[in-house]
Each structure stands twice: as C-alpha cells, then as structure tokens.
Swiss-Prot record:
Gene it is expressed from: dltA
Transmembrane annotation, as ranges: none
Protein name, per record: D-alanine--D-alanyl carrier protein ligase
GO biological-process terms attached to the record: lipoteichoic acid biosynthetic process
Keyword Zinc: no
Organism in which the protein naturally occurs: Lacticaseibacillus rhamnosus
Length: 506
C-alpha cells in the first residue's frame, strides 16, 4: 500500500535511480531522469502557470508526456491529456469546456488555440535541463485535488471532463498493485493513448512498483507486421489493453507462451472480454493469469475484477466482470431506484473512494450522474448488470444509447449530432450492430441524404466520412451508412433508434 502517488514514484528514484522507467523503442529513460526532469519542470510550471488551474497537455506515447504529467502534479496542477491522433475539433471542444489557461505542446499543435498561453517543446526541454527544481512538494496535487481530467464522449457533441482526484487515483492504484499479483520491477506494455483512462492501468501502478513501461505507439500498433515483430522483443511481464487489441495479437500464431516466457499477467478493461478470447489466452499462455476488469472513467479506470480461470470459462458462456474492489460498494437497482434481488437485471451503482467529484464545469450533468451516499460519492453507471448473492457481477448492456467499440466509449447521440452537421445529410441516426458475443461489431448510420451530384452511394459515403472525420474521433465514424427516404419515428416524434437497432441485429 502507498499513501501518495507522487512520493511513491520519487521513492523509487531515490532507491533505484538507474532503473529504467520508460523504454520507447529502445531509447531508455531512468527513474533518476524522471525525477530530475519532473522536478525541474515543476519549478518552471510553478513560476509560469496560474496556481491550481488544470492544464491541457498535447502529445503521444512518449517519455516527455509522463515527465510533464508528473511535473504538473508536483506543481499543483491537474493535467488534461489530448492525444496527437485526435481531430483538430477535439482540442477546441475540450478547451471550450476546460478554459485551461495554458496548453503544453509536447507535440506540435495542428491548430491555433486562441487566447491561451502555449508552452512549446523547446521551452520544456530547456526547463527540464536547467530550470531550478521545485523546492518542496507542499503545493503538489494531494487529497481531493484533481490529478487528471479525461474527456469522454458527451450527448450534445460536447465532451465531458471527468475529474479524477489524487485520492481517487490512490484508491485505484492500491487495489491494482495488491490484487493482481504484480511484482516490484514489473515490465508492462504501455499501449493505450494517455487520453484514454485505460492508460492509467499501466502507467501509475508500474511506476509506483519501480517497473518499466514499454511504449507501443500507434504507428507500430497500426501496422500488424511491425506489431507482431515488435511484441516478442519487449520482454513483457504484464499486458494491459482492451480485449480488441489482444484479439489482433492473437491473429499471430507466434503469440504464445514460448515466445513470451515472462508474460504472466493479462489485464483487460474498456469493453467486454468474450469467452473465446479468454480461452485462447489460457490455452496459449498456460503460465499467465487473465484478469477481466470493469469500470467507468467516472470511477477511476476499474472497480470490479477477477481472474478468469479455465473453470470460469467452462462455467460461464458470458464471462463475469468480477467482484468490487474492497473499498468500494456496488449494488443493482431497478428503474425506480430500488435495490433488486440477486440475479435480477438492473443498473449498477458504484459507491466508494475512487468515484469522481463530477464533470468539469458541468453541474447539470454532474447532478444527473453522481450522488452522495453518506460521506462517500456514488455514480450511476448506466450499465445493466446482474449480480450473484456473493457479489460476482455480470455485464448485460447499456441503459441508454452509449456503446463501447474497441474499448472507446461512444454516445450515439454524439455521433448523430455531428453527422447531422455534415453538409450532405438531412437527417441521420447511428446504431450499433452486435456480434454473436454481444460485443459492438460496428456502428451503422441510417441517413436521409440531401440532393447531391454523386453518381453512387459509395462516393456519397466517402464524402460524408471525410467531412465527419474533421469533426469526430476516428473510432466514432460509422463503418456503414444506409440511405433511406425517411427515418422511422416514435409516437413523440423522435427517431425510433430501437427500431433501427432491431433492424440491423435481426
């Protein structure tokens, strides 16, 4: 158990200064470098940024990002990560909500962000080399101060900034390092982008355990040949990803224990782990333990989990998402908010120290999703589950029209909102198509097109996707667009999304 994330990482630097903290394709950075660089950056940030304000950090999978995060934490600032593969619109949308006084350019910004201070890479590098280090951690992020703010999809096309405090993160990290059997010095894969809270599952537990993060940038993961060649060279003990990503790795017949002798832990979150994927991993990696975990960003990465053994795979065609972590209470309610009996489907409620204080600058959405339970915070997950009498939870679906595709959470209304801005579209509605394992296989849009000059639907679809791609993240672009003269409506005049869902999943 640790009592402070920042001092725990600094302690590793004091005890094991030459140990490698971060390895980017063979370029290695030690804990001493991480401490010295983050201390100097913290000194620089303390002088140059307004006290206590959240700061946007723009960049990819690099050591500099981690160093900047830690420098901001030490100087009393929450960080708001935005990945380099985000559309330009995302940066503007986040800033419209966050009103951050500064943007830190670890990688060059693709657009101009008006009325905000920009700290560019040369200034960062100069500060990390020569600025006087921060003289104490008395103003560092602690307790209920925000540690990071991650933006998720929002229903109005406006993303929601989930505020995660130091103590939220501490609760999660302590559970991760105690319940998943990870050892000091663990070598962990660092693949999810920092703007996706799954990245927290590898980042902070690894650093407080004095381990090594092996960066796997998108340029590698997008090229399967390069990915399959790179993975065995990493010497991993721990694999953290969405199930979708490991399903890509399983396409390589050489992805098995004999080529990964030290790989002993698989941790999954972000979407449903299906039975056949778990079975493939258990068969190919007999020395490894497969952990299935579940949790919304609003409750800090994950709140339930369990080891998926051969017995569990044999017993449950649809795998459980595990038991609540010890400091957290989960329970299931019906539409009236009444607790239901064991085995009855309902909405999962989460109460505990890892539940967020709410959405940044969005009191209405916060009031709708969060509640007080005694002296603790609670969150209405919007997830349909069943729970056994002994507390084992099974995921069943969403209560609303929010889905997960490849681990990314997508509000269908958000996609619709943007699709309906596209110049070729009169009206559109997006629905998920599920595969036989109840996972979202693709997004399909039904659209009423405006009059146009395209000689084929294919060309029209290409034009719509190109325009939409300037507004939303790549994973939010529907794979197929089906054209109609009109969309079905409900009795109260809204597009009947349930009818469209039924049509594509018949």
């Amino acid at each position: 158990m640790i009592d402070n994330v920042i001092t725990a990482i600094d302690r590793v630097a004091a005890e094991h200064p030459t140990r490698v903290a971060y390895d980017y394709e063979g370029t290695q950075y030690t804990y001493a470098q991480l401490k010295e660089g983050s201390d100097r950056l913290a000194g620089f940030f303390a002088e140059s940024l307004p006290a206590g304000e959240p700061i946007i950090v723009y960049g990819g999978q690099t050591f500099d990002m981690v160093e900047v995060f830690l420098g901001l934490s030490k100087s009393g600032h929450a960080y708001i990560p935005i990945d380099t593969h985000s559309p330009n619109e995302r940066i503007t949308q986040v800033q419209d909500v966050a009103h951050a006084p500064a943007v830190i350019e670890v990688a060059p910004l693709p657009i101009t962000v008006p009325d905000v201070k920009i700290i560019r890479a040369p200034a960062l590098h100069q500060a990390e080399q020569s600025h006087a280090p921060i003289h104490s951690l008395q103003h560092a992020v602690a307790g209920d101060d925000n540690y990071y703010i991650i933006f998720t999809s929002g229903t109005t096309g406006k993303p929601k900034g989930v505020q995660i405090s130091h103590d939220n993160l501490l609760s999660y990290v302590n559970w991760n390092i105690s319940d998943f059997g990870l050892e000091e010095g663990v070598v962990a894969m660092s693949q999810p982008p920092y703007s996706f809270d799954l990245s927290v599952m590898d980042l902070y537990p690894t650093l407080v355990l004095g381990g090594t993060l092996k960066a796997l940038p998108k340029e590698v993961t997008d090229n399967f040949k390069e990915l399959f060649a790179t993975l065995p060279k990493l010497g991993l003990n721990e694999w953290v990803s969405t199930p979708s990503f490991v399903e890509i790795a399983l396409l390589d017949p050489n992805f098995k224990q004999e080529n990964y002798p030290n790989l002993t832990h698989f941790l999954f979150c972000g979407e449903e782990l299906v039975n056949k994927t778990a079975q493939a991993l258990i068969t190919r990696f007999p020395k490894a333990t497969v952990y299935n975990t579940y949790g919304p960003t609003e409750a800090t990465v994950a709140v339930t989990g369990m080891a998926i053994t051969q017995a569990i795979v044999d017993q449950y065609p649809r795998l459980p998402i595990g038991y609540a972590k010890p400091d957290t209470n989960v329970y299931v309610v019906d539409e009236q908010g009444e607790q239901v009996s064991a085995g009855t489907e309902g909405e999962l409620m989460i109460v505990g120290p890892s539940v967020s204080k709410g959405y940044l600058n969005n009191p209405d959405k916060t009031a709708a999703a969060f509640f007080k339970a005694g002296n603790q915070r609670g969150y209405r997950s919007g997830d349909l589950v069943t729970m056994t009498a002994d507390g084992m939870v099974f995921y069943r679906g969403r209560t609303d029209f929010q889905v997960k595709l490849h681990g990314y959470r997508i509000e269908l209304e958000d996609v619709d909102h943007n699709l309906n801005q596209v110049s070729y579209i009169k009206q559109a509605s997006t629905v998920p198509r599920y595969d036989k394992d109840h996972k979202v296989a693709q997004l399909i849009a039904f659209a009423v097109a405006k009059p146009n000059d395209f000689d084929s639907e294919m060309k029209l679809t290409q034009a719509i996707k190109a325009e939409l791609g300037k507004m939303v993240m790549e994973y939010m672009i529907p794979q197929r667009i089906i054209y109609r003269d009109q969309l079905p409506l409900t009795a109260n005049g809204k597009v009947d999304r349930k009818a469209l869902i039924a049509e594509v999943n018949h």
